[in-house]
A protein has these predicted regions:
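Rossmann-like flavin
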Residues: 102-205
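N-terminal glycine-rich phosphate/pyrophosphate-binding loop and immediately adjacent elements
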Residues: 2-140
Length: 206
């Protein structure tokens, strides 16, 4: 008996998160003949683990964003709900704790724009408004990227409808954050999640 069939409605190259998510969406729309090709002996891509000496080690991804509580789902959480996948999510009540020995920084930053701005303001008084505006700028640029990535548009329309995106395009994260004239202590509290992706702020595009 042959393992592969002569015909598939869809062939997906790569069994990582994007490939499996695409297969899920296709199945939800009624496509059943799907083949996922993956060169590794395990699917999942960077979302993988291994077992050594009886201990299971997470090799990479260990946290997911954009889930949200039931009834107030965010993008990723809504995707799993729409696909009929019931996951018992373990919520993380705060994004991170930042500790800088010798600099007097040991602060837990909580979820929510205003809450995070208050956390930083408590350690750096007088920074609340600037921090909040910086976070909101990040949100506006993120939302613009969501639209621009799937919507063809002229440069004029982009300038008119997404001015913040155009304004910061081409600048590094450190260049943009410096325009807010925040004390270094506040910058040190804001930026740990950014360098989490593996690039220093000077090299990381905003």
């Amino acid at each position: 008996m042959r393992f592969y069939k002569d015909h598939y409605d869809v062939v997906i190259i790569g069994g990582a998160l994007a490939g499996m998510a695409a297969a899920l969406q296709l199945q939800a729309k009624g496509v059943r003949d799907i083949l996922i090709l993956e060169k590794h002996n395990m699917p999942g891509g960077v979302a993988t683990d291994y077992i050594r000496d009886g201990f299971e080690m997470e090799a990479s991804l260990h946290e997911m964003m954009s889930i949200g509580p039931k009834g107030k789902r965010l993008k990723v959480g809504q995707f799993f709900d729409d696909m009929g996948i019931d996951i018992d999510w373990l919520p993380v009540p705060e994004p991170y704790r930042v500790v800088v020995p010798g600099e007097g920084i040991d602060t837990v930053l909580h979820d929510g724009y205003e809450h995070m701005a208050r956390d930083i303001d408590a350690a750096c008084p007088g920074t609340y408004d600037k921090v909040l505006e910086f976070i909101r700028l990040c949100r506006r640029v993120y939302d613009s990227m969501d639209v621009i990535s799937v919507t063809p548009m002229s440069k004029l329309r982009m300038l008119r409808e997404h001015p913040d995106f155009v304004r910061v395009a081409g600048y590094s994260a450190s260049e943009v954050i410096r325009t807010f004239d925040l004390p270094q202590k506040a910058v040190d509290m804001l930026t740990p999640y950014w360098i989490y992706v593996g690039e220093p702020m000077d090299n990381l595009p905003f």
